[in-house]
Amino acid sequence: MGDVIVLYAAPGMGHIVSMVELGKLIVHRYGPHKFSITILYTCGSVVDTTSIPAYIRRISHSHPSISFCQFPRVTNKITPNISGAAIMFDFIRQNDPHVRRALQEISKSAAVRAFVIDLFCTSALPIGKEFNIPTYYFHTSGAAVLAAFLYFPKIDEQTTDSFKDLRDTVFEFPGWKSPLKAIHMVEPVLDRNDPAYSDMIYFCSHLPKSNGIVVNTFEELEPPTILQAIAGGLCVPDGPTPPVYYVGPLIDEEKELSNDAAAAEEEDCLSWLDKQPRRSVLFLCFGSRGSFPAVQLKEIANGLEASGQRFLWVVKKPPVEEKTKQVHGVDDFDLEAVLPEGFLERTADRGMVVKSWAPQVVVLKKESVGGFVTHCGWNSVLEAVVAGVPMIAWPLYAEQQMNRNVLVTDMEMAIGVEQRDEEDGFVNAEEVERRVRELMESEGGRLLRERCKKMGEMALAALGETGSSTRNLVNFVSSIT
């Protein structure tokens, strides 16, 4: 079987796709004669969707040098009053015996050159070390969040209170231009009494114990102060910082539709975009899981209508619980029932609303698209960057508030919406209209668009033969051979 690199994906479609893209990058650069890729993934998580098996079959067929190892099903224990993050960390720990067994089996027929684990799979780090396999992290967000995670054990020492109670108290991270409000920390650390808090401390403190960290970003995108803070050891003041390899942007260009109805809707929205003037359409999409209650959807609709701008808006079914910002899967629903009465008719000449899904990578590359309202999930950010499209930053969950901070203040790639500093992060119609007009009509929006266009060119150059990301990939491979 030869040399193999084993990748271990955290639960969920997005994490699996990111690992596949890393595997494809390695195989594309070095060919299957150099390395084969085996991707380990779990079964039984609450975030599993029916699209995962079909996706894996498709990748297995189109990329024969990438194979998959699905673990036996583990029951995701749902415990009342425990956060989803804590439940997920526990689920990943329950899979540790399967990780050990998989590495044992693979090692019988191949030389495992590296074991690359998702950040959230930290419990597998000592297993890789146990087999004397160089073990690396794959960080699927940007350098700013990596800097924050590396430094978080020091932040933990600064207070004994929960960040959710500290609210507007600000904390400084090495290299960041502006501090972060306590309430905007990543969700798993907001409540010190939740088990997820200690899980996060554990994984942040173990990042430096790896052989290195592979990051889905590129050097030119990142603020130099943040790159210097990481490289200079400011984020890990009490010990050595492992090598960091910025190899992005890794983007899934092969997303496939789930059914014929989705295919027809895709064709309709792309055809509509082709008929619109250049850079005139605002695209609104909040990720595969981002969802709003009906009251927020109505505010967005009223803001869009008042702005007078053209728009393509992806609307997902509102969550059952009003405060929830995530949905899993794609359920059908009555679109007109969740929007203001008559909205679709009044905006039909300049707007299009689609249910649940649109081909985001393709949409962002359309000439007619001039702006993107995003939840600041890192994959979506990179897709916009590559397409050269400026953003309106509207974070919902996970590390997205951190991404928003850096996109707006440090990178100057986005305009931020003002959200109510409550759990729901509510945005009113007037703020929606204001930010839409600012991006699509103002001189500041035009300058932002020019900046984003240049960054898109840099993204492509980073992956070129002499680009920074190619150089970093070569350095990573050199470290394991």
Curated annotation (Swiss-Prot):
Q: Which InterPro entries match?
A: UDP-glycosyltransf_plant (IPR050481), UDP_glucos_trans (IPR002213), UDP_glycos_trans_CS (IPR035595)
**Record's keyword terms, sorted:** Glycosyltransferase, Transferase
Where do the annotations place UDP-alpha-D-glucose binding?
288, 357-358, 375-383, 397-400
For the protein in the UniProt heading, the enzyme class is transferase
Among Gene3D superfamilies, the record links this protein to: Glycogen Phosphorylase B
Q: Name one Pfam family in it.
A: UDPGT
Here the disulfide bonds are none
What Enzyme Commission number(s) appear in the record? 2.4.1.-
Q: Name one GO molecular function term.
A: UDP-glucosyltransferase activity
Function of the molecule: Glycosyltransferase that may possess chalcone and dihydrochalcone 2'-O-glucosyltransferase activity.
Q: Which family does it belong to?
A: Belongs to the UDP-glycosyltransferase family.
Protein name, as recorded:
UDP-glycosyltransferase 88F3
Report the gene name.
UGT88F3
